[in-house]
């Protein structure tokens, strides 16, 4: 399966400056070229500073082997360490892929029933923020997306803080 077009943005500059674009398959480009002018615009198109930042960012990603390190070191280690949270009484499931992780908060591990109306995710999110950990709550699922350049020691700290915040959340929920 291959897309005909793909929009891209934040990753081009790692969010340092606004930039976006569209990657289009050759077959689509041929159709557009046969049709004459293709008048369009992007909010962040054609800016020379953004283009320079994007090129430099892509160079850094390539030359410093950041994506290779993510694939072989950071992502496998992050996923391994996140899975260690599965034994926590508040955790129904830990899932993830690459540098993304999700921790489902449940009332009962066996049935995976939720803390209905309790806002467990938002309670946990606040404990995370209070303890220097940025995790997003999507309902009662905690989402983590650390930077690509995170070290093993920083992943260890992330998981330690996540466990602390899970403990605090469990206590706040009366567990």
What kind of feature is each model-predicted range?
Residues 1-175:
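Conserved N-terminal phosphate-binding loop of PLP-dependent enzymes in the Aspartate aminotransferase
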